[in-house]
C-alpha cells in the first residue's frame, strides 16, 4: 500500500474515532488535518479519552497563530506530563500548519494506546492479542486459519468469517466460499459496514495482492474487536433489561395464585419498575450530568477570561494614568523651576532698581549743592540779579520734567554757568590788571 493510501485509511478511521469521542461534548470534526489546528478540540479529545481534567488555562477562541500554537503546546504538555504518553517528532507548529502526515502519526500513537493496547486475549495483548482474538473468533470456519495480519486476510474468508460470526442471519457463509477473493473481500466489507458499523477502509484489490500496509490491517481489524465489544455490551444491557421485565411480569402473573398482600406486591413492583427505569436511564442521566457540568465549566472559564480581559484593560488604564502623572510632575517641576528663576530675576531687578535709585538720589543731592554754589557765585558777580529769582527760575524750569530729564537739564545749566563764571573771572582779572597798570603810571 502506498503512503498516500495509508493516509486515506488512517484519516477515515481516525475521523470516525475522534468524532465518536467528541460526540460526548457535542463536537465533531470533518478534517483531522485542519480541525485540530487551534488546539481546542484536541484538548477536548484528550480529556475525554483519558477521563482526566485539563486544568491549564487556554484560549477558547484563538484567532492569532501564536494563540493556536500556545493551545497545542499545552495539549502536548498535558499528554506528556499527565497522561505519560511520549509522542516523538511532532510539535505545535505541525498542528497549526495542518501537517496531516504528522497529525495522523500522532493519532495512531493514541489509537494504539487507547484502542489496541487495551485488547487482550488469553495471555496476549495489543496486536498479538488482537490477532489471537481474530483466530479464536473465526475458529470452525472452513478455510480460515489466522496466523498473521499480512497473509491470513488476503482471500477474504477471514473478514467474511468475522462479519458472519456476529451477524449469522444476515448471510450464509458457504455461499461465498466459491467466489473469487476480491468479490469475497468486497462482500465482507459491505456486511461489516452494514451490520457492525465498521467503515470500509481498505481496497479489496490491494488486500488480495498483499500490498496493504500491516498497520492498516491492524487498524481495520481493531474496529471489528471494538464493534463486537460494543454489541456484547448492548446485548448484556438488553439481557438485564429483559430479566427485569420478566421478573416484573412474573410478579404480575403470580398475583392471582399467591396470597401476597397488595401493598407488598405494589412495593415490589415499584421497586422493580424503579430498577428497570434506573437501568434504562443510567446512561442518559450520566451523559446529562456530564453535559451540565461541562456547560458550567465552560461558563466559568468564559467568565474568568472576561475577568482577565477586564483586569488587563484596568492595568493598561493604570499604566496610562501613571504615565500622565509622571508627565504632570515633570511639567510641575519645570514650572516651579521657572517660577524660581522669575523670582530671582525680580529680586535682582529690585536690588538693581534700589541701587540705581540710591545713586540717582546722591547725584541729585550733589547737583543741588552745585546749583546753590552757582547761585552764590551769581550773587557775587551779577549786580542786578536776584538770587531768589534765579533759584525760582531753575525750580520752575525743572519742576515739570521727569527725574532723568531734570538731571540732564541741571547738568546743561551747570555747564553754562561754569562757562559764564570762567568768563567773568577772566574779565575781573583783566580789569584788575588794567587798574594796576593805570595806578603804576599815575605814580610815575
From Swiss-Prot:
Actin-bundling protein. When linked to F-actin the actin filaments form preferentially anti-parallel bundles that associate into meshworks. Plays a major role in cytokinesis. Negatively regulates cortical localization of rapgap1. Belongs to the cortexillin family. The keyword Cytoplasm applies. The gene is ctxA. The keyword DNA-binding does not apply. This is Cortexillin-1. Homodimer; parallel. InterPro entries: Actinin_actin-bd_CS, CH_dom, CH_dom_sf, Cortexillin-I_coiled-coil. GO terms for molecular function: actin filament binding; alpha-catenin binding; identical protein binding; phosphatidylinositol-4,5-bisphosphate binding; protein kinase regulator activity.
